[in-house]
Amino acid sequence: MADEEISKAFRDLQFKTNETRMRIVQGEQNKKVNHQKMRISESTKRNLIGLNEDLKYYRSVGRMFLLTDKASEIARHETEAKQSKDKIEAIDKQKEYLEKGLVEAESNLRELIQSRR
């Protein structure tokens, strides 16, 4: 009976560690995507700043293009970059939390294995 409980606890801890590792990897992938979005927005903003005010600025929305002005496009790219930066910071905080939980689960797993011997 006790052996079955230990076996079940072992499986649960192992599942938790694997799930946490997968979530950390997924967070890293999301972080890369947001970092790329931030770089694109900042680069586009820098390019827009150097352009003339008299030009027409079009923004693609789905299958159509909207005519906008330079200031609104620069502001839009600034907000996109800020949102991506905020998401990256949130992902970093979540990663720290998950890593703490992973360390705790791994130590519990080690204790369980040692108690089984």
Swiss-Prot record:
One of its GO terms (biological process) is protein folding. GO terms for molecular function: protein folding chaperone; unfolded protein binding. Keywords: Chaperone, Cytoplasm. InterPro entries: PFD_beta-like (IPR002777), Prefoldin (IPR009053). Transmembrane segments: none annotated. One of its GO terms (cellular component) is cytoplasm. It is found in: Cytoplasm. It comes from the Eukaryota. PANTHER family: PREFOLDIN SUBUNIT 1 (PTHR20903:SF0), PREFOLDIN SUBUNIT 1-RELATED (PTHR20903). Heterohexamer of two PFD-alpha type and four PFD-beta type subunits. Binds specifically to cytosolic chaperonin (c-CPN) and transfers target proteins to it. Binds to nascent polypeptide chain and promotes folding in an environment in which there are many competing pathways for nonnative proteins. Has a role in gonadogenesis. Belongs to the prefoldin subunit beta family. This is Probable prefoldin subunit 1. The lineage of its organism: Eukaryota, Metazoa, Ecdysozoa, Nematoda, Chromadorea.
